[in-house]
UniProtKB/Swiss-Prot annotation:
InterPro entries: Cyt_cd1_C_sf (IPR003143), Haem_d1_sf (IPR011048), Host-pathogen_enzymatic-act (IPR051200). It comes from Stutzerimonas stutzeri. This is Protein NirF. The lineage of its organism: Bacteria, Pseudomonadati, Pseudomonadota, Gammaproteobacteria, Pseudomonadales. Transmembrane segments: none annotated. It is found in: Cytoplasm. Coiled coil: none annotated. Required for the biosynthesis of heme d1 of nitrite reductase. Could have a dehydrogenase activity yielding sirohydrochlorin from precorrin-2 or dehydrogenation of propionate side chain C17. Gene3D superfamilies: C-terminal (heme d1) domain of cytochrome cd1-nitrite reductase.
């Protein structure tokens, strides 16, 4: 009796496997559909759409990080929602409303903690990545009038199970250290500059750089030597004396490092600035079609792709990183919001919000490969981000 039973069990297992074929997650990604509060699961091997996940709330300024096994996407919604999406089962695994107005988050180096930055209530909440249970609640500095706490921006994971972020209203940067457990050690950097609005981490995880909305210049913290405090850099970076109208602030995560050069979107100017990655001094300025938003390097650093704010957001320009010449001026369609390279750079995916589509380009031939329908697409995120610090 035992042998037939084992045979039957084996047949049942094989049948189940046939119904749900095994696949990896390394080529998977997601597209945020901001108008419908939904998420598309995509795959780059065949440039196809796999599933649509609905019920994710307000995704008007959503961002996404991934678990270290690349199976789960954590979606930070503007309505304070934190949603864990299973990319293999095509469903919401867990969801919590953790605040009233969220502006992004990060996953710790070891993949165990999720930090969410909040405008309302101002502060950071940290969750267990498996269960989404609250681990720590760190309120931001109260305003002088006591009306509310400062708004949190630029939450980034840094090496050593740490998170770093800035406080827009009180001109501070805080470093949370969870390396000794779930009670963080907090280091506060005060007076970093007026109104930090976003931040980036250099690729090796050493420097945290905060952009300043209230004045020109930027604030840099050396995370190898946090005791040295804040250093002001790039005094000319900003709107300058002319105070040009800014249609959309560039994302500092849209900075890109290519060799010894860093390419930076200039605020309120039709220029991409080039900096020396060692001394943070400007070395060149490249005239472009409009106010740049994302400035992104192909993974081999040979090209720089740039998209723009309104009214030039139908265009994308490609810059040669060596000569600084514009080698292509593309018009993918109305309202190009975001771009994402596959991990090894063979494809460039971009979202065309008002064209209701995602486009896949070959960044070597500069040819359009495929168009895929989408509901007001914005952010595109591939699961390979799981293995990059600061994304």
């Amino acid at each position: 009796m035992i042998r037939p039973f084992l045979l039957l069990a084996a047949v049942g297992l094989l049948t189940a496997c046939a119904q749900q074929p095994l696949r990896g997650t390394g080529d998977l990604g997601v597209v945020v559909e901001r108008a419908t509060g939904s998420l598309q699961i995509i795959e780059s091997s065949n440039q196809s759409q796999i599933a649509r996940i609905e019920g994710l709330g307000d995704l008007s300024h959503a961002s996404v990080v991934f678990s270290r096994d690349q199976r789960y996407a954590y979606v930070f919604g503007r309505d304070g929602g934190l949603t864990k999406v299973d990319l293999l089962r095509h469903r919401i695994d867990r969801r919590v409303i953790q605040g009233g107005n969220s502006i992004g988050g990060a996953i710790s180096q070891d993949g165990t903690l999720i930090a969410v930055g909040n405008y309302e209530p101002g502060g950071v909440k940290v969750f267990d990545a498996k269960t989404l249970e609250l681990v720590a609640d760190i309120p931001a500095t109260p305003l002088a009038d006591g009306s509310r706490n400062a708004r949190v921006v630029g939450v980034i994971d840094v090496p050593g199970r740490r998170f770093i972020y800035s406080l827009f209203d009180t001109d501070e940067t805080w470093l949370l250290d969870f390396s000794q457990g779930n009670e963080p050690q907090i280091t506060r950097f005060e007076g970093i500059g007026r109104q930090p609005y976003d931040a980036l981490l250099t690729p090796e995880g050493r420097y945290y750089i905060a952009g300043l909305f209230g004045e020109d210049g930027m604030a840099k913290i050396d995370l190898w030597h946090p005791e040295r405090g804040v250093e002001r850099i790039l005094d000319g970076y900003g709107r300058g004396e002319q105070k040009l109208p800014v249609y959309k602030m560039p994302h500092l995560e849209g900075w890109t490092v290519a060799g010894n050069q860093t390419f930076v979107p200039a605020v309120g100017q039709h220029r991409v600035l080039v900096m020396d990655s060692q001394n943070w001094q400007q070395t060149a300025a490249i005239d472009v079609a409009g106010q740049p938003i994302f400035v992104m390097a192909r993974p081999d650093a040979r090209q720089i792709w740039v998209n723009f704010a309104h009214p030039d957001n139908h265009r994308v320009q490609v810059i040669d990183s060596e000569t600084h010449e514009i080698i292509a001026d593309l018009e993918p369609g109305p309202a190009v919001l975001h771009m994402e390279f596959t991990a090894r750079g063979d494809q460039l995916w971009l979202s065309v919000r008002d064209g209701e589509e995602i486009q896949v380009w070959d960044p070597y031939t500069l040819k359009l490969l495929k168009r895929l329908p989408a509901h007001s697409p914005s952010g595109i995120f591939f699961s390979s981000r799981a293995h990059e610090t600061g994304l």
